[in-house]
Amino acid sequence: MWKVIIRRILLMIPQLFILSILVFFFAKLMPGDPFSGLIGPHTDPHEVEALRRAAGLYDPWWEQYLRWLGNAIHGNLGMSYNLKEPVMTVIGHRAINTFWMSLLSVILTYLFAIPMSIVAARNEGKWQDQLWLTYNSITFGIPPYVFYLLIIFIFGYSLNWFPTGGTVSPDAMGIIPVFFSKIYHMILPAFSLAVFGTVGIFTYFRSGILDEQTQDYVRTARAKGVKEKVIFRRHILRNASLPIASNFGFVITGLLGGAIFAETIFGYPGLGQLFITSISGRDYSMITALILLNGFLGLLGALLSDIIMAMVDPRIRIQ
Amino acid sequence: MTEKKHKNSLSLVHSIKEELKKDKLAMISTIFLVAVFLIVYIYSMFLKQSNYVDVNIMDQYLAPLTTGHLLGTDNGGRDIIMMLMISARNSFNIAFAVTLITLVVGNILGVITGYFGGRFDLIFMRFTDFVMILPSMMIIIVFVTIIPRFNSWSLIGIISIFSWIGTTRLIRARTMTEVNRDYVQASKTSGTSDFKIMFREIWPNLSTLVIAEATLVFAGNIGLETGLSFLGFGLPAGTPSLGTMINEATNPETMTDKPWTWVPATVVILIVVLAIIFIGNALRRVADQRQATR
C-alpha cells in the first residue's frame, strides 16, 4: 500500500515541474510583473525600476524561474495589481466561499445522480432508463450558462425567491442567521451546478451496475438463494461504486476549483468570479496564481484518485 | 475491394435512415436543423457588414412587434431577427471550423497511436492526461486576452488546442479493439502496408462512431464559443455571436426589463443544441448496433 502511494507521489514530481515551467512562461507572456501592483499615482518610476533590477527581473530566465519557484513554494505569488493586497490573501478569502458552495453542490450532485443511476440501471431499456439517459444527454449537451441565466432570471429576478448575488445578506446578525443566510445565498448556484453535473456519475455508475449484474459471482449468489435485495446492495452496488471512487480525488480538489460561469452569473464571489474580474482588470499576478492553483489541484486530484483507488480496490495494489 | 467498400457505405446510410425512421424525434430534429442552417446561411448572405455594425440610437431597445421589428431591437437599435441570423452564422462557423480541426487531428492521431501502441502510445497518453488536468477554460481566456491582433481565426486556434484530446482518446480506444480482430491480423500477414490498414481498413469501421462523435463535438463547440463570447472573451467586437447577444443579460436591468434582447438567442442555442443531441443519440445507437452485429 505505502509502496504504491510513494511511487505515485514520486511520479507527481516531474508533472509538477512541467506545470511550474508552463505557468512560469505563461506569466512571462503576460504584460506586467510583481511590481506592477505597487505602482500608484505617487510612485517614482525610477524607484520601481530599481526594485525590478534588485529583484532580478533582468537575470537569465532559469535564475528567474528558480527564484519564482522558490517564492511560489513559500506561498508568495506577488501583489494583486487592482486590490493592492498579496495574491494569496485574496485567494484565501475567496477560496472559503468557493469551498462551501462547491461542497453543497457536490452533495446535491451525488444525491441526484446516485438514485437516478440505480433507477435507470434496474429498469434497463424501459422508460425510466430512457428518461434518465435522455435527461443526462441533454444536460451534457446544453451549455450550462444558458440554463444558469434562465434559472436566475426566473427564481432570482422574476419571482424574487432567491438573492441574485453575494454570500450573506447585510442585515443577518449572529451565528445562526448568518449561517442560514449563507446557505440561502448558496442554494441557487449549488442547485444549478448539481442539476447539470450528474452526467459523469450517472454514466459511470449506471454502466458499472449493468456490467456487474452479469458477472459470475452474481449468478453464483443467486444460485445459492441469496435474496435479490441483498445481492444488489451488498454485491452489485459495492463493485459498481468503484468507477465513482476513481474520480473522487478530482471531486475533493475540485471543491477549490471555482466555477467560472456559475459564480459569474449568480454573482457569487468565489475563485471563478475572481478569475473573471482579474482578467477584466488585467490583474496578471492574480491570473497566474489562479492558473497555478488550478493546475496544482488537478495534479493533486489525480494523485488522490489513484490513492483512493488503491485503498478501495485490492487488485490495484497487487499489480 | 471496391465492391465491398461500396456496400459498406450503402449500409451505413441505410442503417442511419432506418434509425431515423424509428426515432421520430431525431427525424424531426434533422429536418429542423437543416432548415435552420439553410435559413441562417441564406439570410446572412444578403446582409452587408454595415447592417449589423452601424448603430442607430433612435431605435434603441424597441419592444417586440414595433413596426418593422418583429422581435424588437437591441442596444444599438439593430433588429433582433437580423442579429440572430448573423450571430448564429458566426457561431456556427466557429463551431464548424473547430469541429473539423478536432476531428481531423483526433482521428489521425487516435488511429496511429491506437494502431502502433507501445512506448510512443504510452508517452502520448501521459501527455494527454497532463493536458486534460490543466484548467483549459482559464488558459483559453488568458490566450484570448493576451494575443495581439485577435480575430476569429485566433479563437478557432485557441479552442482547438484543447478540443482534440477527447476525440483522440475515443478513436484510440476503439482502434485498439479493432487491431486485435482477424481482418487486421490477416492484412498484416499478407503484407499490407500499415498506412493502408490504418486508414483504408480500420478507419472505415469507425466511421459511424466518428459521425456520432462529430455531432456531439459540434454541440459542445457551440456551447464553448457562445460561452466565451458571453463572458466577453469570445468573438471580437464587430463579429456578433449568439453569446454576445446573451451578454446583454449580465446587466440585471436589461435582463428583467428587456428580455427580448437576450431570450431569443438563448432559445436558438437551446433548440439547436437539443436537435443536435437527439440526432447524435440516434447516430450513437446506429454505431453501437453496427459494432455489435459485426
From Swiss-Prot, chain A:
Q: Which Pfam families match?
A: BPD_transp_1, BPD_transp_1_N
Q: How does it sit in the membrane?
A: Multi-pass membrane protein
Q: Which keywords describe this protein according to UniProt?
A: Cell membrane, Membrane, Peptide transport, Protein transport, Transmembrane, Transmembrane helix, Transport
State the GO CC annotations: plasma membrane
Q: ABC transmembrane type-1 domain location, by residue? A: 95-305
Indicate where this protein resides in the cell: Cell membrane
**Any transmembrane segments, and where?**
9-29, 99-119, 137-157, 183-203, 248-268, 289-309
**Major localisation:** membrane
Q: Which GO terms describe its biological process?
A: peptide transport; protein transport; transmembrane transport
User: What protein family is recorded?
Assistant: Belongs to the binding-protein-dependent transport system permease family. OppBC subfamily.
What does this chain do?
Part of the ABC transporter complex OppABCDF involved in the uptake of oligopeptides. Probably responsible for the translocation of the substrate across the membrane. Essential for uptake of peptides larger than three amino acids and for growth in milk.
Outline the subunit composition.
Answer: The complex is composed of two ATP-binding proteins (OppD and OppF), two transmembrane proteins (OppB and OppC) and a solute-binding protein (OppA).
Protein name (database record): Oligopeptide transport system permease protein OppB
Please tell me the species this chain comes from: Lactococcus lactis subsp. lactis (strain IL1403) (Streptococcus lactis)
Swiss-Prot record, chain B:
Q: Which Pfam families match?
A: BPD_transp_1 (PF00528)
Q: Could you tell me where this protein is found in the cell?
A: Cell membrane
Q: Per UniProt, what is the membrane topology?
A: Multi-pass membrane protein
Q: What is the lineage of its organism?
A: Bacteria, Bacillati, Bacillota, Bacilli, Lactobacillales
What's the stated role of this polypeptide?
A: Part of the ABC transporter complex OppABCDF involved in the uptake of oligopeptides. Probably responsible for the translocation of the substrate across the membrane.
Sorted alphabetically, the keyword list is: Cell membrane, Membrane, Peptide transport, Plasmid, Protein transport, Transmembrane, Transmembrane helix, Transport
Q: Which InterPro entries match?
A: BP-dependent_transpt_permease, MetI-like, MetI-like_sf
Q: What family does the Swiss-Prot or TrEMBL record give for this protein?
A: Belongs to the binding-protein-dependent transport system permease family. OppBC subfamily.
Q: Where is the ABC transmembrane type-1 domain?
A: 88-280
The protein's name is Oligopeptide transport system permease protein OppC
GO BP annotations listed: peptide transport; protein transport; transmembrane transport
* Residue pairs linked by disulfide bridges in the UniProt entry: none
User: Keyword Cell inner membrane on this protein?
Assistant: no
Q: How does it assemble?
A: The complex is composed of two ATP-binding proteins (OppD and OppF), two transmembrane proteins (OppB and OppC) and a solute-binding protein (OppA).
Q: Name one GO cellular component term.
A: plasma membrane
Q: Where is the chain membrane-spanning?
A: 27-47, 94-114, 127-147, 151-171, 202-224, 260-280
